């Protein structure tokens, strides 16, 4: 336990030294307006907006991310089932699958899976 604590202190100390060293060695540079402005074929942009944002693409990405996390949570359960085959583990897996399928059906019924709303 003492070794782990000393190792933790050592890592924090090295990180702090590197951060302070970076702060003192780096040179403060003035920002030049011409160098920091975007080059767009010789004219200044009217707005400072970023690239266009597609809301359906974002919603589809969020649904994919949530579904992917659910699958990642499901994988260890499969390995657990291999080692213990009790009724509780089967019940746990079936409840998880029912929730997963129910959310998929709800997304489908509410037309969240369509690309254009």
UniProtKB/Swiss-Prot annotation:
Pfam families: Oxidored_q4. GO terms for molecular function: NADH dehydrogenase (ubiquinone) activity. GO terms for cellular component: mitochondrial membrane; NADH dehydrogenase complex. It is found in: Mitochondrion membrane. It is a multi-pass membrane protein. The chain crosses the membrane at residues 1-21, 58-78, 86-106. Core subunit of the mitochondrial membrane respiratory chain NADH dehydrogenase (Complex I) that is believed to belong to the minimal assembly required for catalysis. Complex I functions in the transfer of electrons from NADH to the respiratory chain. The immediate electron acceptor for the enzyme is believed to be ubiquinone. Belongs to the complex I subunit 3 family. This is NADH-ubiquinone oxidoreductase chain 3. It comes from Apis mellifera ligustica. The gene is ND3.
């Amino acid at each position: 336990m003492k070794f782990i604590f000393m190792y933790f202190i050592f890592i924090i100390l090295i990180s702090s030294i590197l951060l302070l060293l970076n702060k003192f060695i780096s040179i403060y540079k003035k920002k030049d307006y011409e160098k920091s402005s975007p080059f767009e074929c010789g004219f200044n942009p009217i707005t400072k907006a970023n690239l266009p944002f597609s809301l359906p693409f974002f919603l589809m990405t969020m649904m994919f991310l949530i579904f992917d996390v659910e699958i990642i949570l499901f994988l260890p359960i499969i390995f657990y089932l291999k080692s213990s085959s009790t009724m509780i583990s089967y019940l746990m897996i079936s409840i998880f699958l029912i929730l997963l399928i129910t959310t998929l059906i709800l997304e489908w019924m509410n037309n969240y899976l369509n690309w254009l709303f």
